[in-house]
A protein has these predicted regions:
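N-terminal secretion targeting segments of exported proteins
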Residues: 1-57
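Extended hydrophobic/Leu-rich segments
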Residues: 4, 8-11, 58, 62-69, ...
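Surface-exposed alpha-helical segments enriched in charged/polar residues
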Residues: 6, 87, 164-167
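Acidic, low-complexity intrinsically disordered regions
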Residues: 11, 83, 96, 168-171
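Export/targeting segments at the very N-terminus of extracytoplasmic proteins
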Residues: 21-23, 39-109
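Extracytoplasmic and endomembrane cell-envelope/extracellular-matrix remodeling and assembly machinery
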Residues: 31-35, 69, 193
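Catalytic and binding regions of secreted/periplasmic enzymes and modules that target cell-wall glycans
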Residues: 98, 114-119, 125-193
Length: 193
């Protein structure tokens, strides 16, 4: 019986030594101050890292799903799909609601939407109707490294470019649906769930 106790003690000591060595190697120093600081808000550092990783992974998977889809000209994203896509691109809070309302006003959420009415100064593509007419298109192709205007039919590319053009949803001055009030009429329809 004494030999069994000694062996168990040796095993426990070995595992404890391994655990301490691993903690030291990976920069986590055990101690009361660390534990208290990490759990000050009710979440451990590890939990926060997992949530951040999960959110980042979720955004990546969302973008891949929408970018790899094939859309018909009349097909539109549902209100929730559009919200999810815009969130994955980076829009948050008020900017997310505004982006959603602009996309609904401009194209009703249709990735394949196109307005080629040059009389009104349009050659506009995708969910945000990014205008590529004349020099504007040349400049935007160069700035956003677009090989072709057709790439703007990809809702992820369209939304990412819009995110950059609006400085994260803070400057919508290039969109007529903001200027004419059409987007603000859509805000009440934003899917809150």
């Amino acid at each position: 019986m004494e030999k069994i106790k000694q062996r168990l003690s040796d095993v426990a000591h070995s595992w404890t030594s391994i655990a301490v060595a691993l903690l030291f190697l990976f920069g986590v120093q055990p101690g009361p101050d660390t534990s208290l600081a990490l759990e000050a808000n009710g979440e451990s550092h590890r939990e926060k890292m997992l949530v951040a990783k999960d959110e980042k992974q979720l955004k990546k998977e969302t973008l891949e799903r929408y970018s790899n889809a094939v859309y018909k000209p009349s097909e539109m994203l549902t209100d929730k799909e559009l919200k999810e896509l815009l969130w994955a691109v980076g829009f948050e809070g008020k900017a997310l609601k505004t982006a959603w309302a602009v996309a609904k006003s401009e194209s009703n959420g249709r990735p394949m939407a196109y307005n080629g009415n040059r009389k009104t100064g349009d050659s506009s593509y995708g969910i945000f109707q990014i205008n590529m007419l004349g020099n504007l298109g040349i400049d935007r192709k160069e700035k956003f490294e677009l090989r072709s205007n057709v790439l703007l039919f990809d809702p992820v590319i369209n939304a990412e470019i819009t995110y950059h053009m609006t400085q994260g949803g803070n400057d919508w001055s290039s969109w007529s649906s903001i200027k004419n009030g059409a987007a603000s009429k859509r805000l009440d329809d934003f899917p809150n769930k």
